[in-house]
Amino acid sequence: MLHIRFAITLQLFLFISGAMLLQAQSTYMFTNNTYVDHLRTVNFGPTGFEHLFPMLELGGSQSLTLSFDDVQSEVKNYVYTIIHCDRNWEPSGLAPLEYIDGFEEENIQNFDFSFRALQTYTHYDLQIPNRNMGITKSGNYLLVVYEDEEEKQVVITRRFIVVDRQIGISAEMVRPVEVRKIHTHQEIDFDVNFLRLNVRNPMLEISATVLQNQRWDNGIYGLSPKFLNADKAIFDYQGKVVFPGGSEFRLIDLRSLRIPHRDVVFIDVNMDNQMEAELAPIASRSKAPHLSFIDFNGRYVIENQDNSPAEVASDYVYTMITYKVDQPYMDDHVYLFGDITEWQVKDEYQLRYNPAISAYVGRFPLKQGYYNYYLATSPSDADPKAPRVPSLLKTEGSHADTENDYYILLYYRPFGTRYDQIVGYIQVNTLQTR
């Protein structure tokens, strides 16, 4: 009788905890996003290598670091938690005590003040997992940061994954099946060996997600095995796991304000006591031949060649981008696009057309560092309430030979269980598999 009462009490507690969690989740999105204007330069990735993919090994010793700047300067009480999600980035329904070892919420305790910078800010950072918050299950996770522990105003959300490696993945880049995509797209085939798993029905219990350059916005989700061969699941769809190759990313180098990069044609302090810079004009690459060079695949790093440490000694530079065109795009707007925009088309990163110089112009506050980016277009008549879809066809072009990173995530949900595990993960570079 005592065991029955305990089981009922535990189930009731988990139900109530889950209901409270779902109610709180209605105020934010389960994707990478910053919800307030005064937080800038949100970085999240492996500690010491924050530009890399945010992945943890279950039971491993590594950690992820989240860092950001608050330009309102005063010290604030930021609180964070993590939410376990299913393969589709919906709440898994697990209560926090089922996947957290320690406290469900914790304050961000590490902060420092900027110095030697015209733009004042407070720099915050945290590492996860830590001694107060451990992780006990693999899967998709959402890191949520609140401002004010009582009101729980969500200010930052970031996706990350925890992997419990139980299978091996083999992948290769192949020529696209569709003739019209041979010179512009990239296709990836892969197979997994699930010998170590007690899989009853691989078609239902195993699925995969494929990402390009850490982008969740254009990922290919819910891939079931196409064929089975003994203990292997083969994901060879011949035309389904295909991505536009794009072009190598453009760059902005603001690492030094004393000895500016050659593409910085002007740099000075303006009348508002802000550091500002102007970049050399750029143009469309849609019809240009492919040019190969080393890039960061859309990511950025904060680095300062003049002062250290870069996290608090770097200034914000109001950077002007000038995109020359023969004619304005009648049905599209132009946007800065990349990791710096959280891979979203955002109003605050729109370039405006200036007929006097036949160019789109944008001015954006960027912390000193090294940035990769694209210019993307999006329909001007798009529904303002719906996520805008970026296109690179008019601005950047697309080539099959472009160097890109691909990430394969393998999910496993045994029959009768309550959550999706991640049991396999691999990063593939196009240059390494040709």
Language model segments and positions:
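Low-complexity, Pro/Ser/Thr- and charge-rich linker/hinge segments at domain boundaries
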Residues: M29, V162-H185, G397-G424
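Aromatic-rich carbohydrate-binding modules that target alpha-glucans
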Residues: D101-Y124, W216-P225, M320-Q368, S380-R413, ...
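Ligand-binding face of N-terminal immunoglobulin V-set domains in extracellular IgSF glycoproteins
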Residues: L118-D148
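Basic K/R-rich, polyanion-interacting modules in nucleoproteins and related proteins
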Residues: L279-M330, I422-R434
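Bacterial Sec-dependent N-terminal signal peptides
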Residues: M1-T27
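Short acidic/polar inter-strand loop motif in beta-rich domains
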Residues: R87-W89, M133, E147-V155, R215, ...
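Extended low-complexity, serine/threonine- and proline-enriched intrinsically disordered segments
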Residues: E74-G102, R200-L223, D331-E342
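Contiguous beta-strand segments within globular domains
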Residues: T34-H84, K181-V192, D306-I321
